[in-house]
């Protein structure tokens, strides 16, 4: 695959994580750059691994993976988005939330997995092309690191303007990503 195509693929694959990061940044009470970088690193690491996993699965069982990846992503994103909406409606004070609760590792990993299943599907497709899968996966991971960190920082500035609605908006964004994944699968 040509360098330009790899870069375009990498940034294209990072867009779901970018959108989710904006939502996450908006829901946190004044996230610091270190939190944004942590989010970017987690999203980037997961987004690096998923095309590699997809590539391996593509060699073994591409039909099953392609038939189910959109449903898995949809269910995960609907669950996470619904949870964020419910928490946003219930309210509560941002100051009462501990940093671990607000930005837990496992919540970030789950969100990262949900937004990177399309990268796994791309990895399946790459199994049938002449590509350097390691270089391509690293490019996708680096682009996701950059875009997710940037998304968190953008969300940081949007969040105070939205107040409690930020968590609801973040949930709607995740649900929207899930619906978009399902829509794209059924409507090309």
Swiss-Prot record:
One of its GO terms (biological process) is intracellular manganese ion homeostasis. InterPro entries: Mntp/YtaF, Put_MntP. One of its GO terms (cellular component) is plasma membrane. The chain crosses the membrane at residues 3-23, 41-61, 66-86, 106-128, 143-163, 168-188. It is found in: Cell inner membrane. It is a multi-pass membrane protein. It holds the Pfam family Mntp. Belongs to the MntP (TC 9.B.29) family. PANTHER family: MANGANESE EFFLUX PUMP MNTP-RELATED. Probably functions as a manganese efflux pump. This is Probable manganese efflux pump MntP.
């Amino acid at each position: 695959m040509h360098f330009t195509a790899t870069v375009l693929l990498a940034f294209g694959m990072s867009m779901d994580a970018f959108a989710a990061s904006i939502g996450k940044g908006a829901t946190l009470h004044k996230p610091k750059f270190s939190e944004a970088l942590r989010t970017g690193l987690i999203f980037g690491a997961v987004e690096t691994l998923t095309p590699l996993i997809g590539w391996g699965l593509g060699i073994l069982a591409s039909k099953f993976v392609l038939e189910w990846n959109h449903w898995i992503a949809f269910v995960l994103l609907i669950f996470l988005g619904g949870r964020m909406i419910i928490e946003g409606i219930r309210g509560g004070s941002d100051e009462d939330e501990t940093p671990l609760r607000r930005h837990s590792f496992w919540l970030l990993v789950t969100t990262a997995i949900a937004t990177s299943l399309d990268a796994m599907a791309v990895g399946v497709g790459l199994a049938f092309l002449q590509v350097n899968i390691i270089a391509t996966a690293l490019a996708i991971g680096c682009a996701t690191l950059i875009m997710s960190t940037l998304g968190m920082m953008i969300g940081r500035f949007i969040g105070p303007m939205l107040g409690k609605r930020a968590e609801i908006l973040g949930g709607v964004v995740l649900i929207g990503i899930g619906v978009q994944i399902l829509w794209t699968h059924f409507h090309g």
